[in-house]
Amino acid sequence: MPRSLKKGPFVDEHLLKKVDVQNEKNTKQVIKTWSRRSTIIPDFIGHTFAVHDGRKHVPVFVTESMVGHKLGEFAPTRTFKGHIKDDRKSKRR
């Protein structure tokens, strides 16, 4: 069920403060965050966030089409190594 419109999007306060400070200074430094749950708002466009995926920080450059999504959607947490190809040597007996 989606979030109520009267509540507005959820953004961690510390993350919003960091973006506001960079917007005032007109700088575009990478913002390191563990807040995967924060919703991307229009103030974030053009900024790069280093979103934690559980072991490292993945750089995410925010574009206009990402508004409304969560930061965690763009930093996958699971690595898929692929299915194992059939080993002919072990099957032959």
Swiss-Prot record:
Q: Which UniProt keywords apply?
A: Ribonucleoprotein, Ribosomal protein, RNA-binding, rRNA-binding
Q: Does the keyword RNA-binding apply?
A: yes
A GO BP entry is: translation
Q: Which Pfam families match?
A: Ribosomal_S19
Which family is it part of? Answer: Belongs to the universal ribosomal protein uS19 family.
NCBIfam families the UniProt entry points to: rpsS_bact (TIGR01050)
Alphabetical list of HAMAP family matching this protein: Ribosomal_uS19
- Listed name of the protein: Small ribosomal subunit protein uS19
Q: Which gene is transcribed and translated to give this protein? A: rpsS
